[in-house]
């Protein structure tokens, strides 16, 4: 199963300190956390100065409860797939990312990771699913930049971030294809034993 601790360094690599770019639709951010998100989790009375003082503990709390757990990522078998889904949720919001992934999977696009969505993720051929999600995410940011011209200056950075994610098979990947492969190995071992 995927481990959130393996994703955190990948996200933090792309998130600096406090930024207040007037062209950024998210407004003031610190370590990738917007003021609106900070207020959602720690109170509507929180100020920009409170956001500037965001602690690592607060960051982890938001990351886990607002993004990782929303995607049920601990129940995703492949780490690379969990990483790219949760990072998309982090960048675009969980509902948006989950709906896009559900569209790829052909499940109901309700923005909630339930048993059917989770099963579809874990039973898909991992590399193909990862590549489809990555391609969809690249197209998504292209569309955002097209629809919001002021965001075009961020497009190359968004694409570089997405392209920094690579597929890894991972020992934890035991979806349908992993189970079939394990079964095939078991059968071969039985045959080899029989002919000894």
Placement of each model-derived feature along the sequence:
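Cell-wall polysaccharide-cleaving catalytic domain and substrate-binding groove, primarily
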Residues: 1-180, 187-196
């Amino acid at each position: 199963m995927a481990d959130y601790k393996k994703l955190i360094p990948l996200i933090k690599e792309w998130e600096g300190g406090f930024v207040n770019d007037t062209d950024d639709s998210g407004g003031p951010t610190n370590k990738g956390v917007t003021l609106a998100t900070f207020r959602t989790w720690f109170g509507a009375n929180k100020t920009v100065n409170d956001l500037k003082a965001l602690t690592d503990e607060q960051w982890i709390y938001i990351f886990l409860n607002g993004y990782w757990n929303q995607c049920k990522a601990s129940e995703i078998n492949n780490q690379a797939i969990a990483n790219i889904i949760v990072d998309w949720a982090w960048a675009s919001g969980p509902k948006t990312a989950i709906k896009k992934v559900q569209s790829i999977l052909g499940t109901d696009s309700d923005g909630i990771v339930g048993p059917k969505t989770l099963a579809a993720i874990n039973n898909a051929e991992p590399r193909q699913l990862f590549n489809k999600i990555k391609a969809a995410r690249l197209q998504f940011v292209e569309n955002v930049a097209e629809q919001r011209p002021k965001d075009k200056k961020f497009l190359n950075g968004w694409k570089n971030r997405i392209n920094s994610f690579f597929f890894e098979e991972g020992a934890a990947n035991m979806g349908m294809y992993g189970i079939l492969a394990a079964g095939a190995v078991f059968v071969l071992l039985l045959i080899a034993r029989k002919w000894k």
